[in-house]
Amino acid sequence: MASKSWLNILTFLCGSAVGFVLCSQLLSILFEEQKDIQPSILHNDPHARHSDDNEQNHLEGQMNFDADASQHKDENTDIADKLYQKVKILCWVMTGPQNLEKKAKHVKATWAQRCNKVLFMSSEENKDFPAVGLKTREGRDQLYWKTIKAFQYVHDHYLEDADWFMKADDDTYVILDNLRWLLSKYNPEEPIYFGRRFKPYVKQGYMSGGAGYVLSKEALKRFVEAFKTDKCTHSSSIEDLALGRCMEIINVEAGDSRDTTGKETFHPFVPEHHLIKGYLPRTFWYWNYNYYPPVEGPGCCSDLAVSFHYVDPTTMYELEYLVYHLRPYGYLYRYQPALPEKMLKEVSQIYKNEDTNVNQEPLKEKHK
């Protein structure tokens, strides 16, 4: 009887062990599948991850989209060219020594070429890239220090070279032409800044760091002065929130960056995370952080989107192609809101000088 009892116990223990092993393997498989479906950016803390420095980069070398420019030789860019002259944007890109070749060079090869001036801000100087050395340490706890010092550097060296000053990450993709249209309605001498507006912790809201944000010249002046007079201090390592608190203290307005239809232009994730319904779980922090009611699916994003975040190098080039090269034959753009009245007159004059009789509607059709 005793031997039978021991046999039952042994059988139970063996069965439990086998069950545990099989269960562990099954859970491991499920977690791997979940990891593939929900990429690592889906942290439940909006400040838990910024730009990973240890991601695998599967892209060797840079790509030159200008190498095949023959199809664009007759492209009419008069309006974009006029905006480039009238709405001058200095872009500074937050990066690090280990990311210059992994990420920053792909920013440099794509959207950064459309900035009026671009600077890459790192903890160490690199004269070959080149990158500005801010003499900080690397790490998430240094993000706000890097931001403060970067804006101070820009203020001291390039204040008169631009009207607007944009901060972006080395995994952010920015459509500068759309940003210029957005900013063309505003005066850079007014204290205002734009980005993806979040609402917690700051009464007027603050701008998401990853989606990028842009300060008017007056906002930049006030920000730098605030650290000289101790109106603002390094109050937190959470860069975007800390900067937002400072902006509120110094009476810099958190601007509305939505387009004329109410759609968002700055996006804290890659396009598919906003476009695919159900991709971001309802328990995810994102749904509680948006200042304006968030939309998922095709209505999520403006046709004149300004930025996307968590863009790896391969996707950087994909977006470059989709934004500036892919066209459906035979279509005029369906959504192209008018320019401000003063700028519209200036652009119209270009066509008049070319003996083109232009009013606002033909102007929209001509710039495709």
UniProtKB/Swiss-Prot annotation:
<feature type="binding site">
    <location>
        <position position="169"/>
    </location>
    <ligand>
        <name>Mn(2+)</name>
    </ligand>
</feature>
<dbReference type="Pfam" id="PF02434">
    <property type="entry name" value="Fringe"/>
</dbReference>
<keyword id="KW-0464">Manganese</keyword>
<dbReference type="GO" id="GO:0006486">
    <property type="term" value="P:protein glycosylation"/>
</dbReference>
<dbReference type="InterPro" id="IPR003378">
    <property type="entry name" value="Fringe-like_glycosylTrfase"/>
</dbReference>
<feature type="modified residue" description="Phosphoserine">
    <location>
        <position position="235"/>
    </location>
</feature>
<dbReference type="GO" id="GO:0046872">
    <property type="term" value="F:metal ion binding"/>
</dbReference>
<protein>
    <recommendedName>
        <fullName>Glycoprotein-N-acetylgalactosamine 3-beta-galactosyltransferase 1</fullName>
        <ecNumber>2.4.1.122</ecNumber>
    </recommendedName>
</protein>
<keyword id="KW-0479">Metal-binding</keyword>
<comment type="similarity">
    <text>Belongs to the glycosyltransferase 31 family. Beta3-Gal-T subfamily.</text>
</comment>
<comment type="pathway">
    <text>Protein modification; protein glycosylation.</text>
</comment>
<feature type="disulfide bond">
    <location>
        <begin position="232"/>
        <end position="246"/>
    </location>
</feature>
<feature type="binding site">
    <location>
        <position position="171"/>
    </location>
    <ligand>
        <name>Mn(2+)</name>
    </ligand>
</feature>
<feature type="binding site">
    <location>
        <position position="140"/>
    </location>
    <ligand>
        <name>UDP</name>
    </ligand>
</feature>
<feature type="topological domain" description="Lumenal">
    <location>
        <begin position="30"/>
        <end position="368"/>
    </location>
</feature>
<feature type="binding site">
    <location>
        <position position="309"/>
    </location>
    <ligand>
        <name>UDP</name>
    </ligand>
</feature>
<feature type="binding site">
    <location>
        <position position="169"/>
    </location>
    <ligand>
        <name>UDP</name>
    </ligand>
</feature>
<feature type="binding site">
    <location>
        <position position="138"/>
    </location>
    <ligand>
        <name>UDP</name>
    </ligand>
</feature>
<feature type="topological domain" description="Cytoplasmic">
    <location>
        <begin position="1"/>
        <end position="6"/>
    </location>
</feature>
<comment type="function">
    <text>Glycosyltransferase that generates the core 1 O-glycan Gal-beta1-3GalNAc-alpha1-Ser/Thr (T antigen), which is a precursor for many extended O-glycans in glycoproteins. Plays a central role in many processes, such as angiogenesis, thrombopoiesis and kidney homeostasis development.</text>
</comment>
<feature type="binding site">
    <location>
        <position position="139"/>
    </location>
    <ligand>
        <name>UDP</name>
    </ligand>
</feature>
<dbReference type="GO" id="GO:0030154">
    <property type="term" value="P:cell differentiation"/>
</dbReference>
<feature type="binding site">
    <location>
        <position position="285"/>
    </location>
    <ligand>
        <name>a glycoprotein</name>
    </ligand>
</feature>
<keyword id="KW-0328">Glycosyltransferase</keyword>
<feature type="disulfide bond">
    <location>
        <begin position="91"/>
        <end position="115"/>
    </location>
</feature>
<keyword id="KW-1015">Disulfide bond</keyword>
<keyword id="KW-0472">Membrane</keyword>
<comment type="subunit">
    <text>Homodimer; disulfide-linked. Interacts with the C1GALT1C1 chaperone; required for galactosyltransferase activity.</text>
</comment>
<keyword id="KW-1133">Transmembrane helix</keyword>
<dbReference type="GO" id="GO:0001525">
    <property type="term" value="P:angiogenesis"/>
</dbReference>
<keyword id="KW-0597">Phosphoprotein</keyword>
<feature type="binding site">
    <location>
        <position position="310"/>
    </location>
    <ligand>
        <name>UDP</name>
    </ligand>
</feature>
<dbReference type="InterPro" id="IPR026050">
    <property type="entry name" value="C1GALT1/C1GALT1_chp1"/>
</dbReference>
<feature type="binding site">
    <location>
        <position position="94"/>
    </location>
    <ligand>
        <name>UDP</name>
    </ligand>
</feature>
<keyword id="KW-0037">Angiogenesis</keyword>
<dbReference type="GO" id="GO:0016020">
    <property type="term" value="C:membrane"/>
</dbReference>
<dbReference type="GO" id="GO:0001822">
    <property type="term" value="P:kidney development"/>
</dbReference>
<dbReference type="GO" id="GO:0016263">
    <property type="term" value="F:glycoprotein-N-acetylgalactosamine 3-beta-galactosyltransferase activity"/>
</dbReference>
<feature type="binding site">
    <location>
        <position position="146"/>
    </location>
    <ligand>
        <name>UDP</name>
    </ligand>
</feature>
<feature type="binding site">
    <location>
        <position position="309"/>
    </location>
    <ligand>
        <name>Mn(2+)</name>
    </ligand>
</feature>
<keyword id="KW-0547">Nucleotide-binding</keyword>
<feature type="transmembrane region" description="Helical; Signal-anchor for type II membrane protein">
    <location>
        <begin position="7"/>
        <end position="29"/>
    </location>
</feature>
